[in-house]
Amino acid sequence: MTEIISLKQKRHQKELKYERKMLRELNLTEIKTRIDDCFRSFEGKFKKTIIEDGCIDFAIEAFLLGAKYSRFGYYGESMHSANKRCQFEEKRLMDDLFDYLLNWGKIKEGDLLIEELFLACEYYIHSWWEQGYTKGEKRYKLRLH
């Protein structure tokens, strides 16, 4: 006998399958080099291993978010307008990464590095979102989704 599953479960299974396929596109060494590029100026303020662990998680989340919204690019929407669709989720990722780095770093409340750190977090998350978007759009165009 066949098992009956709801539409919600089916969508969730399909989304997980797509995410697994997209994660094959990620490269850990590329993530680590991007971490070094973005957060090199804060080298004395953070312990590198702790920061790498968190940044890898946030890079994966941002990459998958961009890949999820790449479907709209396949149907003719620009990257900018697709980014506006997920502005709330991307902003949440930026804020969470910023809070993570503030909690694990040695940056004081009145320090001028806070604004610089926030801009670095914005750049880091948005660059991974863009990469996920372009790779996801490529997969859609090649019909590999």
Where are the regions a protein language model picked out?
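Intrinsic-disorder/low-complexity detector
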Residues: 2-145
